[in-house]
A protein has these predicted regions:
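Bacterial Sec-dependent N-terminal signal peptides
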Residues: 1-25, 460
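A non-transmembrane, solvent-exposed segment enriched in polar/low-complexity residues
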Residues: 19-180, 187-191, 195-217, 221
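Helix-turn-helix repeat elements of alpha-solenoid scaffolds
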Residues: 161-167, 248-257, 288-291
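Thiol/disulfide oxidoreductase modules built on the thioredoxin-like
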Residues: 191, 413-456
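Charged, long alpha-helical assembly modules
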Residues: 191-268
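N-terminal "domain-start" segment that seeds a small globular fold
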Residues: 306-343, 409, 453-460
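Short active-site neighborhood of thiol/selenol oxidoreductases, capturing the structured segment around
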Residues: 341-370, 381-383
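Structural microenvironment flanking redox-active thiols in thiol-disulfide oxidoreductases
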Residues: 364-401, 414-420
Length: 460
């Protein structure tokens, strides 16, 4: 009797102290040597742990190959849900996976993790990836047949479309049944795409139906979907990629319509806040000032006071101080002992504001090219702003730029901390801004070639 009791105590103690492992193998390894593990909660990432990548060389088919390996331990109290292993600060530098009280192991290429990840341990992740591959293979055939039918209106194509549609429904039903009671069941149900029972006759009908039914199988009330990247990823695709127009005004309208449609589907306060914050951040990254203003006025400012963050709003608006649709931030400078201000200049129908530096090799090459080109556009007043540590080299350089307004900005510690430079939130030099006569920013060309293209087309 005592032996049985002791065995039971040992068993229950081992259960209480049980740990799960998350192991990843990079092939080939990334440049960095660190990985951070997060749990996804809403639209945010909750830090859990970090690990160092250990490098190993193995022989595969007689050739040496370097692998990068990392591992994490999760306690028995770790909650099921969506997790993320991040190995890079920017870009697609992470692998998302599900944890549901089981060990997780995967192999991937860090350059394209989504396409390459292979789970070698974890029933949940293996099944979900198997489902995605099976479903997407059939969906690809359906998409191809839909495109073909628009071109040919063939009865055989329509028949093939219906056959593949039945195959897709069978795949969906099979994996929903296989995943019954599992964490990934909610994601398998929500990953289903809308397909009409018959192929559409034209592109517009197809796009309209796809847009109207994009969220047909998405449960916005699901906590499992909320605590993952799934909802945000779907919303991102719908708002920014499903509808697109080359016309900027039309594109702004499409973005607003898409966001309005999304917000109508959300009834949860916590999801509403998460989506609003995400969309504002995404639009800010895209430097879409008018859309961000609209988001603040239409949604953010109407949130309960406790859900608003003054610092969040200020940060986003500061980033957008100098973007298309905004009045260019004002600054002053001296020319021949005379004071000038950008806001009061009145010597051009339009203005080209260019930020550059004598310490920038691209600038040294592009500014003379720009100067030569702008001689053919005398109706445009050019304001060049040198970002410098000191004035001597700049003084000599601008002697070759007569007829331009040449301003300079310095800073005792770091030239890019100059007040004017910070207002324009420059991502690099040279940076170009086209202003109308009222100093509204109307274009932000990326390179000198884009400046030339803009003014040449403007002259036509």
């Amino acid at each position: 009797m005592m032996k049985k009791l002791l065995a039971l105590l040992i068993f229950t103690t081992s259960l209480a102290n049980a740990q799960y492992t998350v192991k990843g193998t990079m092939t080939p390894p990334d440049k960095g040597d660190w990985v951070i593990l997060y749990k996804i909660e809403g639209a945010k990432q909750k830090f859990l742990a970090n690990a160092t990548i250990k490098f190993d060389t193995v022989a595969i088919s007689g050739e040496k190959q370097v692998l990068g390996k990392f591992s994490f331990e999760l306690p028995n109290t770790a909650t099921p849900g969506a997790y993320r292993a991040t190995y890079r600060n920017s870009g697609a530098g992470f692998v998302d996976f599900f944890f549901n009280k089981e060990n997780v192991e995967f192999v991937f290429n860090p350059k394209y993790p989504d396409q390459s990840v292979l789970f070698t341990s974890s029933r949940e992740n293996k099944l979900y990836n198997e489902y995605l591959q099976a479903y997407n293979a059939v969906q690809k055939k359906i998409d191809s047949l839909q495109a073909s039918y628009i071109e040919t209106k063939s009865k055989d194509t329509k028949k093939a479309y219906k056959k593949e549609l039945k195959e897709l429904e069978d795949v969906q039903e099979m994996y929903e049944n296989k995943s019954e009671g599992m964490l990934v069941n909610s994601f398998i149900k929500a990953s289903r795409r809308y397909n009409s029972s018959n192929p559409h006759d034209n592109v517009q009908d197809y796009l309209s139906a796809t847009s109207e039914n994009f969220f047909e199988y998405v449960d916005f009330k699901s906590d499992k979907l909320y605590n993952s990247s799934f909802l945000i990823d779907r919303i991102n695709d719908y708002v920014f990629y499903l509808n697109y127009s080359e016309d900027k005004d039309v594109q702004q309208k499409l973005i607003k319509e898409s966001i309005t449609n999304v917000m109508k589907k959300i009834s949860s306060d916590k999801l509403e806040k998460a989506v609003i914050n995400y969309l504002i951040s995404a639009l800010t990254e895209k430097r879409n000032g008018p859309a961000v203003d609209w988001m603040f006025a239409e949604y953010y400012d109407k949130l309960p006071a406790e859900d608003q963050d003054v610092d969040f709003k200020k940060e986003k608006l500061d980033i957008l101080l100098a973007t298309v649709g905004r009045v260019a931030p004002d600054f002053s400078w001296k020319e021949n002992d005379q004071e000038y201000k950008l806001s009061t200049l009145n010597d051009g129908n339009k203005y080209l504001l260019v930020f550059w530096s004598t310490g920038c090799p691209h600038c040294i090459k592009e500014i003379p090219e720009l100067y030569k080109f702008m001689q053919t556009h005398k109706e445009v007043s050019v304001v060049s702003f040198g970002i410098e540590n000191e004035e001597n080299e700049w003084d000599e350089f601008v002697k070759n730029l007569p007829g331009w307004h040449n301003a300079i900005g310095t800073h005792p510690e770091y030239k890019f901390d100059n007040e004017t430079v910070k207002k324009y939130n420059l991502l690099g030099t040279p940076s170009y801004f086209v202003l109308d006569k009222d100093k509204n920013i109307i274009a932000m060309p990326d390179h000198v070639e884009d400046v030339e293209k803009y003014f040449n087309s403007d002259k036509e």
